[in-house]
A protein has these predicted regions:
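Conserved short "hinge" loops at termini or chain/domain junctions
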Residues: 1-51, 102-127
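Elongated alpha-helical scaffolds
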Residues: 51-62
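Short loop/turn elements at secondary-structure junctions
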Residues: 61-127
Length: 127
């Protein structure tokens, strides 16, 4: 498990988050590490913030998907189901965090943690 249950602040999903959802999230993150060539024993402890966020948002997305009426075969509009709305939001978030993670994020090699893109610069002009 890559996050703490205390990190779950979503009032709608928190009571529904199951051990199976968390296990699926853990398997997903382990699979990402394997795709990046990182073996389980090389994953640093504690894990980096981007990995915790990825695992959390993936677990919440799975929880919302499982609770959604859209997956039960009922004929509904996507906008009518609060769980489906949450699923869409959390799917977007886990994909955003996944794009920021590299092998170095898992291992902490050379002090790199590519999950954060700092410093940021932006051109500012009048116009």
């Amino acid at each position: 498990m890559y996050f703490h249950m205390e990190d779950v602040r979503d009032a709608l999903l928190q009571p529904n988050l199951s051990d199976e959802d968390v296990a699926e999230s853990t398997e997903y993150v382990d699979g990402l590490a394997a795709r990046l060539g990182v073996s389980p024993e090389r994953i640093r402890t504690p894990v980096a913030y981007p990995i915790r966020q990825l695992a959390l948002f993936y677990a919440l997305m799975v929880c919302a998907r499982n609770a959604s009426d859209m997956t039960s075969g009922r004929s509904m509009e996507a906008g009518d189901d609060p769980y489906e709305k949450k699923r869409v939001v959390y799917e977007r978030e886990y994909m955003r965090w996944e794009a920021r993670i590299s092998a170095e994020t898992f291992t902490g090699a050379e002090g790199k943690d590519l999950g954060e893109n700092f410093p940021l610069t932006a051109k500012v002009g009048r116009g």
